[in-house]
A protein has these predicted regions:
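Post-Walker A alpha-helix
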Residues: 155-156
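Glycine-rich, often acidic-flanked micro-motifs
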Residues: 2-32, 133, 137-147, 161-321
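Long, basic/Gly/Ser/Thr-rich N-terminal segments
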Residues: 1-104, 312-321
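Conserved lysine of the Walker
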Residues: 152
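Extreme N-terminal, non-catalytic leader segments
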Residues: 80-141
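A broad, low-specificity signal for short, low-complexity segments enriched in glycine/proline
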Residues: 39-40, 57-61, 96-98, 103-107, ...
Length: 321
């Protein structure tokens, strides 16, 4: 079988198997990362080394830690998920060996690969990415920062329904272009909770599941023409907060430079991988963002306020800036 090339987060990926949720990469481009997906029948035992990182969140079925990361003696990393998916990332971050157990699937593996695993690879390469969605608003992008329950995916889909392009729903890699700070596009799919699908489309079954092992629903942005593949300078960064009782929500509020630094540093993607050089690069990049780009608090109002109205408030703020 011929290898397949894809583009995501500024990287050209070459995989030995087709993967969903990724935009194609030209055959003339040199791959930055080779992905070898191995037979699920050979899923290995856990490494004997002490885990470098153990997640606080637990698998509902087994009660085991959802993610364990091992750093091997050759400086490579193994990311092992309780769902039966494992990734061995080479020390130079140019190769990934991916495996999944018989009770898992290629689709399950891909959902981890295209989000947290590639986010980890970016981190290994010294690329600073935010836990954020990125939206194409014309000749520039806006970045909406927030944790896993901030509503980034739902908000991204609503922006798409208002005619904007979605560049990424969860990982927003930053790049410095002269004095400007830009954001690169990521994957072509959005993962939505059933409650969000019901809110947006009237029924939780309006979109298909990613797989039988995962409750989240899959929205293919490329199929609907809502994916933006452009790298764009950032017009503004919005830190999402859900103050349902705020009388003026949805609204946009200014943040001091100090508060902006704290919020952005707290939302650096894959910050479990840490060393001094990376920390210095983080500080430099975040300082550049705060120095050159408006960083504001965006109060959504939670589910008590229509998401469409929140998106309109943000777009009005972008136009007024």
């Amino acid at each position: 079988m011929h290898s397949v090339r894809y583009s995501a987060y500024g990287l050209c990926l070459e995989s030995n198997l087709p993967l969903q949720g990724l935009a194609p990469c030209g055959r003339t481009e040199v791959p930055d990362l080779l992905i070898e997906i191995e037979d699920g029948e050979r899923f290995p035992a856990a490494p004997t080394e002490t885990a470098y990182y153990v997640s606080d969140w637990r698998d509902q079925g087994s009660g085991d830690a959802g993610l364990k990361i091992y750093k091997l003696t050759d400086a490579s990393y193994i990311l092992r998920y309780a769902e039966g998916v494992e990734f061995h990332i080479a020390a130079d971050s140019t190769r990934i060996a991916a495996r999944f157990a018989s009770h898992s699937s290629l689709v399950d593996m891909t959902s981890f690969l295209t989000g947290p695993v590639l986010g980890f690879v970016l981190r290994m390469r010294g690329v600073i990415a935010l836990h954020a969605c990125a939206i194409d608003v014309g000749d520039k992008a806006i970045v909406l920062v927030g944790d896993a329950f901030a509503g980034k995916s739902t908000t991204a889909v609503m922006f798409a329904r208002l005619g904007c392009g979605v560049m990424s729903e969860d990982v927003a890699p930053l790049c410095l272009e002269g004095r400007a700070v830009a954001v690169r596009p990521g994957c072509t799919e959005v993962a939505l909770r059933p409650s969000a699908v019901k809110y947006l489309y009237g029924s939780a079954d309006a979109l298909p599941k990613f797989s039988d092992n995962w409750e989240k629903r899959r929205l293919d942005l490329a199929a609907t023409g809502a994916f933006s593949h452009r790298t764009l300078p950032i017009a503004a960064v919005y830190v999402l907060t859900n103050h349902g009782t705020a009388p003026d929500a949805p609204c946009v509020r200014p943040l001091s430079s100090g508060a902006a630094m704290v919020e952005l540093l707290a939302n650096i993607y894959a910050n479990r991988l840490f060393h001094r050089e990376l920390r210095l690069r983080e500080l430099d990049t975040v300082h550049r963002v705060v120095e050159t780009i408006p960083v504001k608090e965006a109060v959504t109002g939670g589910w008590s306020s229509p998401v469409e109205r929140f998106c309109e408030v943000v777009l009005d703020d972008v136009r007024a800036s």
